[in-house]
Amino acid sequence: MPKYTLPTRDALLKAMQVGETSIEAAEYMATRFEQILTKAKLLPECNDMLEKIKEYAQFVKFKLLSSAQVWSGQERPTSDYQNTQENKAEFLASHLEGLPSGLKLEVAIGDDAKILRGFSSNGKMVEGDQLKTMDGLLEGWLAKNSLAISGGAVVKIDNTGNQTKVDPQEIRQLINDSEKGVAKYFADKGVGMEVAQRTYQEPKALETKREEIRQEIESGAEAPTTQSIR
């Protein structure tokens, strides 16, 4: 019975480079690698590497989403900030025709309260007016919790429009709160939204992450051979 070698280190590294070009390429890379391991019945032995590849693909996806979807929020340091944003959210919620299914928000809060976010629908980037709608609703959620975006970071805002720093851990916990969280707010507006928090990464983190996985790959042994899995 013919034998085939699973992807070599060089092949995996090249696949990672290709996977950085688009969300679809990143997801395909991870999915294809898992399929190969499954068919070869080598999933248990290579599961650690698979998890690394999946982590990298997810990281690339979030980076591409957050960099392509420039935050569209407007700073409104006024006394009626909450009312303005809530009215805007209500208006957007009443005009949801044609909204795609499988919506997902991936969000990361840095230790300095910097925020990155990306919206997708069934793995594809949300764009145009639909992105504006999603951002508008997210701004409504922030305002409802006396929060706003200033200089790319989340800040507290009071009734007079004064801004103060906020504990990033409080924001992270609030995002996932069952009663006050983002998913609940979107659901109340009639929008099903999966919410996933990611680790905040600085702009050069992709290169760092790539180097970490490259070292993991190069420090390991070549994958064993197995029967044909084509």
Curated annotation (Swiss-Prot):
GO terms for biological process: protein transport. GO terms for cellular component: cytoplasm. CDD domains: DotY_NTD. The gene is dotY. The T4BSS is a complex nanomachine composed of several subcomplexes. This subunit is part of the Type IV Coupling Complex (T4CC), a subcomplex composed of the DotLMNYZ core and the IcmSW-LvgA adapter subunits, linked by the C-terminal tail of DotL. Six DotLMNYZ hetero-pentameric units may assemble into a hexameric nanomachine, forming an inner membrane channel for effectors to pass through. Interacts exclusively with DotZ. DotY and DotZ are co-dependent for the assembly into the T4CC. Component of the Dot/Icm type IVB secretion system (T4BSS), which is used to inject bacterial effector proteins into eukaryotic host cells. Part of a subcomplex which recruits effector proteins and delivers them to the core transmembrane subcomplex. DotY and DotZ play a role in effector translocation, but are not essential and do not influence the stability of the subcomplex main components. The DotY/DotZ main function is to optimize secretion by modulating the delivery trajectory of the IcmSW module and the localization of the machinery to the poles. Its main location: cytoplasm. It is found in: Cytoplasm. InterPro entries: DotY (IPR056465), DotY_N (IPR049927). Residues 204-217 have a biased composition (Basic and acidic residues). It comes from the Bacteria. Disruption phenotype: Deletion of the gene leads to a reduced intracellular growth in the protozoa A.castellanii and decreased levels of effector translocation. Deletion of dotY results in the absence of both DotY and DotZ proteins in the coupling complex. Deletion mutant shows significantly reduced DotL polar localization. Residues 202-230 are annotated as: Disordered. Pfam families: DotY (PF23131). This is Type 4 apparatus protein DotY. Keywords: Cytoplasm, Protein transport, Transport, Virulence.
